[in-house]
Amino acid sequence: MASTDTGTDAKKDGSSAAGESQDVQDTHDLAGLEAGLDALESAQAGRTPLRETLIRKALPPITAVALVLVVWQLLVWAEVAPDYKLPSPSAVWDEVTNAWRQGTLLDYIWTSVSRGLLGFLMALAIGTPLGLLVARVKFVRAAVGPILSGLQSLPSVAWVPPAVLWLGLNNSMMYAVILLGAVPSIANGLVAGIDQIPPLFLRAGRTLGATGLRGAWHIVMPGALPGYLAGLKQGWAFSWRSLMAAEIIASSPDLGVGLGQLLENGRNNASISQVFLAIFLILLVGIAIDLLLFSPLERRVLRGRGLLVTR
């Protein structure tokens, strides 16, 4: 009887060991499969010819710009509007070359870009801890959450008159308008990202001792990164629009001539070509910031999470 029990136990132990061995083997197989897929994707990405990459990424926007220029020139030739309402592409290009020769073109751009980036960094420093606080503290969310949503929907231009009355015509007024426009977007983006973190991650972090600031740094922020990045992109868009509204409305010689002031000067001088120049420069800066800063960050985050789809 004892030998039978011993044999049964041995069989159970053998079966258990075999099962564990099979589980380990399955785990190794799965890890190997994932590594192989990652290597395959990397190899495919690495084998993409430069010519194909340029055609796939550069040709569509170049074609779109060329099409816009052709349609624009056709409208000018058709005289659908007088010259003082619709300038020709060559007239706008003349404005570009004149500003370049006078040495003012880069000054226009840098005046606005430096303000916009500095204001965005200040909004980032305020909106990030505010978003963490709103997302993690129920009372703060109930009290401040609706206000942030309301501020985000409020047009930034509405803040320019009170900012001028409070602070005067200076750079502080510009930064105040940027903060009021961008902070709610950054905070709400982080809140949305934190709300999308699986509760299992948070419980696992608490079990392993990641609480307080450690939990926020190692669990919450990495888990909320996709939503947070979307909030940052929207925050920059609000920063840039807020700055343009402030520069257009609150103009002063002491503030220098930024792109918004250039647009307003064109209106005051009835120079539609200068107005178009300012609009194109504002658009160009927005596209450049997205392509050089936010798009690489977004691709890196998605690639690190296995969510990047290559086409």
Where are these regions (language model features)?
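Generic hydrophobic transmembrane alpha-helix motif, especially the helices
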Residues: 149-185, 192-193
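A membrane-interface signal for the N-terminal entry of alpha-helical transmembrane segments
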Residues: 118, 269-298
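Transmembrane alpha-helical segments of polytopic membrane transport and secretion proteins
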Residues: 1-63, 291-311
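Transmembrane alpha-helices
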Residues: 176-180, 212-246, 277
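Glycine-rich helix-loop "coupling/hinge" segments at transmembrane-helix boundaries
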Residues: 165-166, 242-276, 281, 306-311
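Transmembrane-helix boundary motif in ABC transporter permease subunits
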Residues: 118-148
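Short helix-to-coil transition segments within interhelical loops
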Residues: 154, 194-200, 204-224
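Periplasmic/extracellular loop-to-transmembrane helix junction in inner-membrane transport proteins
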Residues: 45-53, 78-121, 261, 265
